[in-house]
Amino acid sequence: MKGIFLVLEGIDGCGKSTQIEHLAQWLPLSGLMPSAAKLFITREPGGTRLGKSLRQLLLGTSPTDESPKPLTELLLYAADRAQHVSQVIQPKINNGDWVISDRFSSSTLAYQGFGRRLDKSLIKELENIATQGITPDLTFLLEIPVSESIKRRENTRKDRIESEGEIFLKRVSDGFSYIAKNDNWLVIPANQKKDIVSKQIENKLINYFQNISSLKNERS
């Protein structure tokens, strides 16, 4: 039996890391996971040893003072994802385990496609290669206003992508809202107290797996 692949997406400051930490504690005790399944938490970029080096280049924490151009940036994200899928996500899912990733391919479409305004058809072509056909079972978009994102990050050290201006971030936010119209996306208003957001995610997951169970029973 294959495992489950969950992804949390959203603009910077939306609270993904906080909610993933909560899920890491809640899911194994929720009764949703098979007893033999393990839960793995990962992220993009940087979900592998190679990916950590790529993350430094992409986010501007590398010793080099040379920033990648937009097309180079896109290709580096694709390289990170190809390694991540091959080395982490695919093997874990094939083993029946559950994987939660902080960002996946939709972040590339939102940031590089909508934010950088790179060719979206090229991005999708690269993503098809990098993901090797892997798609999340469910993606949560933690949605906050751009103004709230900026406010939350006021006194934090920003990486290269986070340092982009408000106009760029608005394009990214609009991109996520557009992408989230696809199937298997759930939008959570994240401009609320953390525990309220956590409870909404829990309820959505419970409903999702109950519906899957009902469909299986109908077909059997």
From Swiss-Prot:
Q: What biological-process terms (Gene Ontology) are attached?
A: dTDP biosynthetic process; dTTP biosynthetic process; dUDP biosynthetic process
Q: Does the keyword Ribosomal protein apply?
A: no
The membrane spanning regions, by residue number, are none
Give the UniProt keywords, A-Z.
Answer: ATP-binding, Kinase, Nucleotide biosynthesis, Nucleotide-binding, Transferase
Q: Which Gene3D superfamilies match?
A: P-loop containing nucleotide triphosphate hydrolases
The lineage's top-level taxon is Bacteria
Entry-linked CDD domains: TMPK
GO molecular function per UniProt: ATP binding; dTMP kinase activity
Catalytic activity annotated for this protein? dTMP + ATP = dTDP + ADP
**Which GO terms of the cellular component aspect does the record hold?**
cytosol
- Binding positions for ATP? 10-17
Question: What is the E.C. number?
Answer: 2.7.4.9
Q: What protein family does this chain belong to?
A: Belongs to the thymidylate kinase family.
Q: Which PANTHER family match?
A: THYMIDYLATE KINASE (PTHR10344), UMP-CMP KINASE 2, MITOCHONDRIAL (PTHR10344:SF4)
Role of this protein: Phosphorylation of dTMP to form dTDP in both de novo and salvage pathways of dTTP synthesis.
Q: What is this protein called?
A: Thymidylate kinase
Originating organism: Prochlorococcus marinus (strain SARG / CCMP1375 / SS120)
